[in-house]
Regions:
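Boundary/linker segments flanking structured domains
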Residues: 1-36, 41-113
């Protein structure tokens, strides 16, 4: 992922320049290390999705573009597990969901299988 950057509309406009599916992590920096508090994805436009978080408690973000909505879903699932979502270490309350039209499975835990 690219970043971390300050979570503001101006910075998102400057750094996230393509309309694309993608993934992101929200958090803060402590001792020069990015601390992940929330992971997410956008199936169509990662910049628009990030802007929905402006004004929340999160100070910074990292992001990456994805090649497809499915790739974004799979990466969000991996991030959720890698950053401790199942142990409550991130603010995500539930496992990432898939779009209603999709029959995708989580690459880590095979939920929805």
């Amino acid at each position: 992922m690219e970043g971390s950057y300050i979570l503001s509309t101006d910075v998102i406009n400057e750094k996230v320049t393509r309309t694309s599916p993608g993934n992101y992590a929200l958090g803060y920096v402590k001792d020069n290390k990015f601390i992940v508090q929330y992971v997410g994805r956008a199936d169509k436009d990662v910049a628009s999705r990030l802007k929905q978080h402006v004004g929340e408690k999160y100070k910074r973000f990292k992001f990456s573009y994805a090649t497809s909505p499915k790739a974004a879903f799979e990466k969000e699932c991996e991030n959720y597990h890698d950053f401790g979502g199942t142990e409550g270490k991130v603010d995500n309350k539930i496992h990432p969901d898939r779009p209603v039209y999709a029959n995708w499975k989580c690459p880590k835990c095979k939920i929805f299988g």
